[in-house]
Amino acid sequence: EFFGWRLAFFVVGVPGLLIALLFRFTVKEPIRGAAEGRVVSDDQPTVLETIKYLLNKKSFLHLAFGAALAAFVGYGLISWFPSFLQRSYGMQTGEIGTYLGLVLGIPGGIGIFFGGYIADYLGVKDSRWYLWTVAIAMLITAPLYASVYLSSTANMSFFWLIFAVGIGNFYQATSFSQTQGIVEIRMRSVAAAILLFIINIIGLGLGPQVVGILSDYLRPTYGNESLRYSLLILSTFKIWSAYHYYLAGKHLKNDLITN
């Protein structure tokens, strides 16, 4: 609304290209296994071998589904929250983009950092806490998201969203780091890609779609407020996510690869 939609692509894309070039010419490729003091075979496992390996790790199965459910809620919000603000609070697209970008970006980044930091702090003594911290975070975010959607004003909705997004992003750093810890060194990149694929298929593929279907179903009863209650229903999936992270933590100690 303020600058035109095309400018957004330049703002997001150009810095990435510059960073990629800088990274290419300044960062040296590390030696595989050097950090762990291990000798790594030159044989690269196939994608199918990595998938079979992960399927035998109970912690990964629960971790992946827990992360996908967390993303399911997150992508549902990102896709439909602007429409929710317009319908329920009468906000304009320009101010929505300004405030929503700040709320999703800054607290989200802080949440990823502190989620990893807290998990590392507690996980040193008991590895199960690497994922149990995420389980607790997911439980906390369920009522926070509910508060976002049930707020009487847009300002209060944004206030609760700050905490919901911050704590809700605790799962990201820990999920990928622990996936790296349960596979062989030569499998790490593919394992991370598989996790991201699962997250996107369920989170990005189904989250926005389910919100829209629920909103249409509830519209005869709630009218323009149907989107509010559709998003509210979606927030309960955080509890389901917490359950899987709890189970993942129980199995993590047995699945981690030690030096």
Model-derived regions, located:
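Loop-to-transmembrane helix entry/capping segments in MFS-fold secondary transporters
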Residues: T93-G97, I185-L195
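Helix-loop-helix hairpin linking two adjacent transmembrane segments in secondary transporters
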Residues: E1-E29
